[in-house]
Amino acid sequence: MKMTLPDFHCAEVLVVGDVMLDRYWYGPTSRISPEAPVPVVKVNTIEERPGGAANVAMNIAALGANSHLIGLTGIDDAAHALSEKLRSVKVRCDFVSVPTHPTVTKLRVLSRNQQLIRLDFEEGFDNVDAQPMFERIEQALPHIGALVLSDYAKGALSQVQEMIKLANAAKVPVLIDPKGNDFERYRGATLLTPNLSEFEAVVGHCKDDNELVEKGTRLVKGLDLQALLITRSEQGMSLLSVDQPPLHLPTQAQEVFDVTGAGDTVIGVLATAIAAGKPLNEACFLANAAAGVVVGKLGTSTVSPIELENAIRGRAETGFGVMTEFQLKQAVVDARQRGERVVMTNGCFDILHAGHVSYLENARRLGDRLIVAVNSDASTKRLKGESRPVNPLEQRMIVLSALGAVDWVVPFEEDTPQRLIADVLPDVLVKGGDYKPEEIAGSEEVWAAGGDVKVLNFEDGISTTNIIKAIKNQ
């Protein structure tokens, strides 16, 4: 089973918001200035990239979709540079020129892959007449599959409620990357994509996943949204919807060089996937994979379809990820030939939470490779009751396979994985909870083959049951 990319070429997305130009000055530094205790950078490279809403539009175009951008600029060299850069990558620019204001520009000075300083050139557009933007939006709405409102608090979205109403009237999904702590102004949007600090600035600190789900669900209902996607840095993303259980996606970033523009990539890929026909949960999975790619690059960057394809398929194509039993057995044989110690655990993993992640990380530390065997939907229903599983097998396995601690994910139909364990014969069999080792399914077979059986504790107070109760109490 593999996640597939949609046909992005059939998607058309409109981006409206605060456009800006990101300028980068690069050079070596080898001495301190005699004028002040600051490094001296000898600039040898100058680079210009579209930023803010323009970076969102770039991300959409990079996927091969039709990207249309509306924003406010000055009449200056920065506006010209911005237009030229965007048109060169097939972004359709529809700027409203404001002669009294400069184009928002951010200048970053970097040396040895480190940002030393940022200089901002800007003047807010809050009091600029919004009617020309409304007219452009109305003309575009009949032709698009999604509208992105990219808010950097520079004034282009000072009349954001009117824009939301226009999109809702046209039945076009409107996705917003919010700014500030007044989320009331985004009432009626389809989805907001705040980062964790932006979210907690509105609802208060969340001590755990349960509280995050509770407060986020309340916010979704209170603002008449359809969903909320909270980006959580090294903790991945959490999708909270009106009529669906929470979906927690672990980060896929291998190395983080620069988070500049990562939020633009998330909302750009999310909107494009939705416009191309993907359901929200799959669109979020693609956005999460794209974020993992882009933070490994320096500066505002985009993700190509090939990079995204590699991000979602790379592990499976190199012998990792979701597998059939036949594929798993061969992968285990190959691992043992490399001298690797194989660990195996199992469970329903219906709503993945921090307790699960911690448990799986601890299990992985017992060896070199970790297998997670997952109960099928029918098996989960027999064990947990008619209301379960909340998430279907395919989604549960996709989320598990994205965890860095997990190497192989395989489904099984029985109530216990005893047959599967007997076939695989892991070096270490692990189970979470208060079991005795001899009570664990497959323990006798593993011991007979010379393996170990371990019991690990779960984190107290975190459980799927508690999360479900929190949702029902809303």
Curated annotation (Swiss-Prot):
TM ranges: none
Region (Ribokinase) residue spans: 1-318
One GO CC annotation: cytosol
Pathway: Nucleotide-sugar biosynthesis; ADP-L-glycero-beta-D-manno-heptose biosynthesis; ADP-L-glycero-beta-D-manno-heptose from D-glycero-beta-D-manno-heptose 7-phosphate: step 1/4; Nucleotide-sugar biosynthesis; ADP-L-glycero-beta-D-manno-heptose biosynthesis; ADP-L-glycero-beta-D-manno-heptose from D-glycero-beta-D-manno-heptose 7-phosphate: step 3/4; Bacterial outer membrane biogenesis; LPS core biosynthesis
Region (Cytidylyltransferase): 344-474
InterPro entries: Bifunc_HldE, Carboh/pur_kinase_PfkB_CS, Cyt_trans-like, PfkB_dom, RfaE_dom_I, RfaE_dom_II, Ribokinase-like, Rossmann-like_a/b/a_fold
EC number: 2.7.1.167, 2.7.7.70
GO biological process: ADP-L-glycero-beta-D-manno-heptose biosynthetic process; lipopolysaccharide core region biosynthetic process
Active site, renumbered: D264
Keywords for the protein's UniProt record, in alphabetical order: ATP-binding, Carbohydrate metabolism, Kinase, Lipopolysaccharide biosynthesis, Multifunctional enzyme, Nucleotide-binding, Nucleotidyltransferase, Transferase
PROSITE patterns, alphabetized: PFKB_KINASES_1
Residues involved in ATP binding: N195, L196, S197, E198
Catalysed conversion reaction: D-glycero-beta-D-manno-heptose 7-phosphate + ATP = D-glycero-beta-D-manno-heptose 1,7-bisphosphate + ADP + H(+); D-glycero-beta-D-manno-heptose 1-phosphate + ATP + H(+) = ADP-D-glycero-beta-D-manno-heptose + diphosphate
Pfam families in the cross-refs: CTP_transf_like (PF01467), PfkB (PF00294)
HAMAP family: HldE (MF_01603)
Protein's job: Catalyzes the ADP transfer from ATP to D-glycero-beta-D-manno-heptose 1-phosphate, yielding ADP-D-glycero-beta-D-manno-heptose.
PANTHER family: BIFUNCTIONAL PROTEIN HLDE (PTHR46969:SF1)
Summary of subunit composition and partner proteins: Homodimer.
Similarity comment: family membership: In the N-terminal section; belongs to the carbohydrate kinase PfkB family.
Protein name: Bifunctional protein HldE
